[in-house]
Amino acid sequence: MLMQSIYLSKIREQNPLIHNITNIVAANFSANGLLALGASPLMSANVEEMQEVPKISQALVINIGTLIGKDREAMLQAGKTANEVGIPVVLDPVGVGATSYRRETIRELLAEVKFALIRGNAGELAAIAGETWQAKGVDAGQGEVDLKAVAEKVAQRYGCTVLISGAVDIVSDGTQTATVHNGTSLFPKVTASGCLLSAVCAAFLAVSEGNYFSATLEACVAYTIAGECAAQGLTTQVGQFQIRLLDELAALSPETIGQRGRINE
């Protein structure tokens, strides 16, 4: 099924400011990816700023990849402030199943903050859903569960949209579910490629006027198409792929999304 691009042009027109509380591995890549797409990144995790920064932003990303110092406190404060001013909040629960501290952090965030989108790999979403899964650190790992059912369960439980990233991406808001069949096997070879997808989703949500399911679906299609284009002619050249991905995000057009997007609903 083909899709019509609605939000990419709005990102380029509105240049939304995306507040990222992200990990030290992903910060540079996420910031440059947002710039390439047409959004503006703001990378701040200083707890003393968290009552102000969300008020000047159009979306917030909370990424727990490298929890350091007062990050947890900053995430909670930023999330609450974002909820107060009504901007969408994206949660990337990196490696949530790996340690008790990560699990406790996610439990507290989900209890205290209303999220528009939870974006993670299969292992991370299975952990949030309470399903058995053999995660490998912050990587997806392996398991034998129905991932569509996991996405729907988490979406219904927390009243949000869910995106499970993988060879086939799953998007659900608990009532409607779609799968995205674009992408490349090089994505898992580049660290923070999933973190950048979360930031890209935030940019799409920022201009969506509350239509979070359709915005997440288009964000996923757009990003995975950019990955396909970046991977053309490459096999193991992951360094070139990373640079090309930024180039393809900048070159991406609504027409390309409409022509190349492969989704099932």
From Swiss-Prot:
Protein role: Catalyzes the phosphorylation of the hydroxyl group of 4-methyl-5-beta-hydroxyethylthiazole (THZ).
A Pfam family of this chain: HK
Reaction equations catalysed: 5-(2-hydroxyethyl)-4-methylthiazole + ATP = 4-methyl-5-(2-phosphooxyethyl)-thiazole + ADP + H(+)
Top-rank taxon, per record: Bacteria
Protein name in the entry: Hydroxyethylthiazole kinase
Cofactor: Mg(2+)
Species assigned in the record: Haemophilus influenzae (strain ATCC 51907 / DSM 11121 / KW20 / Rd)
Biological process annotations from GO: thiamine biosynthetic process; thiamine diphosphate biosynthetic process
Amino acids binding ATP: R119, S165
UniProt GO molecular function: ATP binding; hydroxyethylthiazole kinase activity; magnesium ion binding
InterPro entries documented for this protein: Hyethyz_kinase, Ribokinase-like
Keywords, alphabetical: ATP-binding, Kinase, Magnesium, Metal-binding, Nucleotide-binding, Thiamine biosynthesis, Transferase
Phylogenetic placement of the source organism: Bacteria, Pseudomonadati, Pseudomonadota, Gammaproteobacteria, Pasteurellales
Top class in the EC scheme: transferase
Protein family (similarity comment): Belongs to the Thz kinase family.
Listed EC numbers: 2.7.1.50
Annotated substrate binding sites: M43, A192
Pathway(s) it belongs to: Cofactor biosynthesis; thiamine diphosphate biosynthesis; 4-methyl-5-(2-phosphoethyl)-thiazole from 5-(2-hydroxyethyl)-4-methylthiazole: step 1/1
